[in-house]
Amino acid sequence: MEPGKETAATSEQKPRPTLRASNTNRQPKVKRRKKDLEELKKEVVMDDHKLTLDELSAKYSVDLTKGLSVTDAQEILTLNGPNVLTPPPTTPEWIKFCKQLFGGFSLLLWTGSLLCFLAYGIHVSYYQENANKDNLYLGIVLSAVVIITGCFSYYQEAKSSKIMESFKTMVPQQALVIRDGEKMQINVRDVVLGDLVEVKGGDQVPADIRVIAAQGCKVDNSSLTGESEPQSRCPDCTHENPLETRNIIFFSTNCVEGTARGVVIATGDHTVMGRIASLTSGLTMGKTPIATEIEHFIHIITAVAVFLGVTFFFLSLILGYTWLDAVIFLIGIIVANVPEGLLATVTVCLTLTAKRMARKNCLVKNLEAVETLGSTSTICSDKTGTLTQNRMTVAHLWFDKTVYEADTSEEQTTGKTFPKSSDTWFYLARIAGLCNRADFKPHQESLPITKRTTTGDASESALLKFIEQSYSPVSEMRQKNPKVAEIPFNSTNKYQMSIHLLEDNSEAHVLLMKGAPERILDFCSSFLLNGQEYPMDEEMKTDFQNAYIELGGLGERVLGFCFLNLPSNFSKGFQFNTEELNFPMENLCFAGLISMIDPPRTAVPDAVSKCRSAGIKVIMVTGDHPITAKAIAKSVGIISEANETAEDIAARLNISISQVSNKSIKAIVVHGSELKDMDSGQLDNILKSYKEIVFARTSPQQKLIIVEGCQRLGAIVAVTGDGVNDSPALKKADIGIAMGITGSDVSKQAADMILLDDNFASIVTGVEEGRLIFDNLKKSIAYTLTSNIPEITPFLLFIVLSIPLPLGTITILCIDLGTDMVPAISLAYETPESDIMKRLPRNPKTDNLVNDRLIGMAYGQIGMIQALAGFFTYFVILAENGFKPLDLLGIRLYWDDTNLNDLEDTYGQQWTYEQRKVVEFTCQTAFFISIVIVQWADLIICKTRRNSLFKQGMKNKVLIFGLLEETILAACLSYIPGMDVALRMYPLKINWWFCALPYSVLIFIYDEVRKLIIRRRPGGWLEKETYY
């Protein structure tokens, strides 16, 4: 967070304000909340790190030796409130449950249900005791479907808002403060502005503190800034940016070693962490792409239903029906258009995919996020722990004037090696192992060295593991060469020195040193080459400088190593004084350089390459140093070999950056300080203009601004991260992806998905599954909607031609919630038709889940053939029973007259009302069976949208089971005794099953020919009109 940018003083806490201003300028709550959120997005104004100690003391009215008085502290606590984070307003569980019951598709089904109850009510009031109860049953079933599906969805997604709870777990419980000159342990809630606080290794920092004294203090800022290495702290202001200066320690970060004393400059919500917490909890998430698609689908279905309903309402009035009958028809047509089983089908399909993804280490917290990942067009990825292994590892060595590469892979299996027989390596390894404060935690002997946990900072731990693996057990080395004196590393000296007794001469001592390479070289007057000592010369200094620049340019942390065999007068028992040096610290012998980096994960380069093939832009957004960020970006392929930054081109051509042509720049590394001064238009221009982008040294607010910039340009954005600093961006993203192992609780709560193995490569798997489920949902919806036409047309012809009802309401329910359900769900198991990772991400504005082409295919083509099959069977059965098709026209009023028991058929036979109804229900059963038979073909053709079935094959076992299940269920509904009473379904003659079979074959042949033409003439008329 950079100073110098004027913001409202919302982050400024006053230790001694005299009164609280009343809020006379009252604004509407929503506007005020939006304004507060915009303030939180801005960088914090802070100048405490620049103040002298006297100015600091005066600003906070505190004695820097004795601290605040107990009375003053109590006054400030009363005025400013406790040092806690304000919990956000949480959504009650009952509201979440209601959203599942009444949101999206459920609303359509509730409308259908209410219309059914209305129709039944009208029937009851008109027909009294003879009222048809079909609409009552349909209304009850629709309500039950919504409630059961809603409960299922709520159960799948049930998660309380625990974002602030996870922040609370990060807050330390006790703090050591100095008040009235006395040290006292107090509850962290009671820490106030201006308090003098002491922090030691192992403590969590209780507030934002300006350091006034420190001894070897290092803090782990990784959760805030993304820096993977502990940062040293001292009283001096070392940077304009308060996040980068060394004299401030932040609330909830960990002090890993040393001690520090300082003055509290911010508490609770006003701390950097508090602002992130407020920002995260204040953000609202937009609709997921799949929610938008379902809303679009509802609009289409509603429009079709209302259009048909209103059209036939007026048509029925024209044909002479009463207005009461016309209203009943209107309601019936609208309800018939509602695909009752689709809500359950979509929910189950998403759930199945979520479970499949969980087996591949992608834990989805929100079902709709399953598809969102497939729609992703931009991934904003954190570096530390996501693209990298989150462990410092030795990457290169430089000794004997040669750079050697070490094995940085997670499995240590690349076989990279270096000359371990060199005497120089013998010295270098001993210095790295002995002049080292890191150690292995006990009882880990059975674990591989790379998997063992250590005590000590990241760089020393990396050296410890490397020496243990490449040289010899460090513990044995330390036993044989006991340490007798030490000067720990500090930011002023920039070196660490230790003195040891020699293994082969127990009376002599050796002085070992490591640290910043330029400092180490200053101590040296000689150097080792192939184990021999030579005087330091200009050639060696030039070689050293070149190696240092090369390794530093790779974004690696470079350390220099040297030693000195102390003269014989420093024999065993000599009392070394490290305060007032009584031993030589010059004329040391330079041994070499070792560089370390947090290396990329093995699978990441391949994953980034797959993302690029899939048309997904991968942007690195990190708090780490630009050189390190750029090096990792190049090693994983975020910046590809073919593309160069302006700096790369300038260096290659030996020209200034201003002379580089903008057309030749394809990649860019943007520093947080540059981003701070950009407006949204400039940021948008960078996001549009460059293919490969790295943002380095970014603050949490800037990460959020980058995500919002991508979304402004129409991208579906996925954000990956593991730290607290990532949580605002994770929540704002279309899909937030947190790390399961290294991720903080806060990031996991803010995210929609968790990578259980912390592997960026798992995201590619998730994208593939997301794209596949979108394709398969299209197929499921196409299959489900097709049967709507043979369900609606009987009702329409019943009105227009006044024939006996060909298909009843109960039978429609048996299709939608019975025979169609398992086959529709089985399409979720369908394998992709082609490499779905080779195509561009779908355009949410044009590539809809349900489009006019899908509706045209389902309703206008396949659905019509299915309706013909049903009517053919219907008319065959009635003809066999004596009623020829032409004689059925206009017969409905007589057919449904309960008092007419001598209705004559075509041949003069008389039929009672009961006999007519048995034939009618038999026809309805046959119509139902016909739909099942033509749905066989529909299911098979829905397996693919472009490929031939003969290429795709019938390997989907769940789909084969679905075919068998719907056939057996249809047979059971027809032939089980009692169904004539329960569902008005009657047994059929076997030959009536075959009436629809030719239509089923016709559907299959028609669709295979259509797909063949589409494949032969890509982009042609047929593809434009029918490829959904």
Curated annotation (Swiss-Prot):
Catalyzed chemical reaction(s): K(+)(out) + Na(+)(in) + ATP + H2O = K(+)(in) + Na(+)(out) + ADP + phosphate + H(+)
Active site: D382 (4-aspartylphosphate intermediate)
PROSITE patterns per the UniProt record, alphabetical: ATPASE_E1_E2
Subcellular location: Cell membrane
Enzyme class: translocase
One Pfam family, short name: Cation_ATPase
Extracellular side: 114-137, 315-326, 798-807, 872-923, 976-990
InterPro entries recorded: ATPase_P-typ_cation-transptr_C, ATPase_P-typ_cation-transptr_N, ATPase_P-typ_cyto_dom_N, ATPase_P-typ_P_site, ATPase_P-typ_TM_dom_sf, ATPase_P-typ_transduc_dom_A_sf, Cation_transp_ATPase_P-type, HAD-like_sf
Keyword Transmembrane helix included in the entry's annotation: yes
Region described as Disordered: spans on this chain: 1-36
Positions in the Cytoplasmic compartment: 1-92, 159-294, 345-777, 829-848, 944-956, 1012-1028
Phosphoserine found at: S948
Gene Ontology molecular function, alphabetical: ATP binding; ATP hydrolysis activity; ATPase-coupled monoatomic cation transmembrane transporter activity; metal ion binding; P-type sodium:potassium-exchanging transporter activity
Alphabetized UniProt keyword annotations: ATP-binding, Cell membrane, Ion transport, Magnesium, Membrane, Metal-binding, Nucleotide-binding, Phosphoprotein, Potassium, Potassium transport, Sodium, Sodium transport, Sodium/potassium transport, Translocase, Transmembrane, Transmembrane helix, Transport
Enzyme Commission code(s) on record: 7.2.2.13
Gene3D superfamilies given in the database record: Calcium-transporting ATPase, cytoplasmic domain N, Calcium-transporting ATPase, cytoplasmic transduction domain A, Calcium-transporting ATPase, transmembrane domain, HAD superfamily/HAD-like
Gene Ontology CC: cell projection; photoreceptor cell cilium; plasma membrane; rod photoreceptor outer segment; sodium:potassium-exchanging ATPase complex; sperm midpiece
Broad class of where this protein is predominantly found: membrane
Binding-site residues for Mg(2+), renumbered to this chain: D722, D726
Region (Interaction with phosphoinositide-3 kinase): 87-89
TM segment ranges: 93-113, 138-158, 295-314, 327-344, 778-797, 808-828, 849-871, 924-943, 957-975, 991-1011
Regulation: Specifically inhibited by an endogenous cardiac glycoside, ouabain.
NCBIfam families for the chain: ATPase-IIC_X-K, ATPase_P-type
Subunit structure: The sodium/potassium-transporting ATPase is composed of a catalytic alpha subunit, an auxiliary non-catalytic beta subunit and an additional regulatory subunit.
Free-text function comment from the UniProt entry: This is the catalytic component of the active enzyme, which catalyzes the hydrolysis of ATP coupled with the exchange of sodium and potassium ions across the plasma membrane. This action creates the electrochemical gradient of sodium and potassium ions, providing the energy for active transport of various nutrients. Plays a role in sperm motility.
Protein name from the UniProt record: Sodium/potassium-transporting ATPase subunit alpha-4
